[in-house]
């Protein structure tokens, strides 16, 4: 369950300095010592009695020291890049089944936010209107994409990385809260809430969001709520 994700993420530090949150690339991790280095640092959190494909336990596999470690790429356990993991799951009236935010790639100034929804009913609707100069949207609004989950006609494409509306991008806006039942590339950066469940296509609360509705997000409280009367959601 997603509640377990929060527990694991809160206990597991970010040790690898890779894009989009860092400066290096995957090949740099390989040259810095690879996953073996990372696993050795994470030993306090691992079940070391698990068997590997060689028949050895994980502990036995990690006994030997790495020949080389580049600490600019892989930090030590006691000197992490971030003390908590990159993912956090959010729950509330907008996502009773949960949603996921990659906090390590998000803007911390948006972690506690309340804003007005700007809704796109589908990928086609998004494509047709996102760059419209007459789109009613401001930097503190929250973009919402519906019907992009696994049960939708779109079948959950990597569409969660909603573009910043052209009129805002031209004024210098680099990030804003974006919410959908879609997914996105692991290399994407932004304050983007994904995998909202239940999804819009099966009648989840996401499908009920209208332009102008208020949405509140709190990473601290692990919450994401649609601020309308419960009776309206029930109907």
Regions found by a protein language model. Name each.
Residues 1-200, 204-235:
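Catalytic or ion-coupling anion/metal-binding cores of large enzyme and transporter domains
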């Amino acid at each position: 369950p997603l509640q377990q994700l929060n527990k694991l993420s809160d206990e597991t530090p970010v040790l690898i300095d890779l894009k989009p949150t860092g400066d290096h690339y995957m090949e740099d991790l390989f040259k810095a010592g690879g996953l073996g280095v990372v696993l050795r640092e994470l030993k306090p959190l691992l079940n070391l009695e698990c068997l590997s494909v060689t028949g050895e336990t994980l502990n036995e596999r990690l006994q030997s020291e790495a020949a080389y470690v580049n600490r600019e790429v892989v930090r030590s356990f006691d000197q992490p890049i971030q003390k908590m993991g990159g993912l956090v799951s959010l729950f509330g009236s907008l996502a009773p089944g949960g949603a996921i935010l990659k906090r390590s790639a998000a803007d911390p100034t948006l972690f506690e936010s309340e804003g007005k929804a700007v809704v796109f009913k589908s990928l086609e609707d998004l494509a047709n209107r996102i760059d419209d100069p007459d789109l009613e949207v401001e930097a503190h609004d929250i973009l919402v994409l519906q019907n992009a989950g696994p049960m939708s006609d779109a079948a959950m494409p990597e569409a969660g990385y909603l573009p910043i509306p052209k009129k805002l991008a031209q004024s210098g806006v680099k990030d804003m809260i974006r919410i959908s039942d879609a997914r996105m590339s692991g290399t994407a950066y932004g304050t983007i809430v994904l995998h909202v469940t239940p999804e819009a296509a099966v009648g989840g609360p996401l499908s009920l969001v209208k332009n102008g509705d208020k949405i509140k997000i709190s990473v601290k409280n692990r919450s994401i709520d649609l601020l309308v009367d419960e009776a309206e959601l029930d109907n």
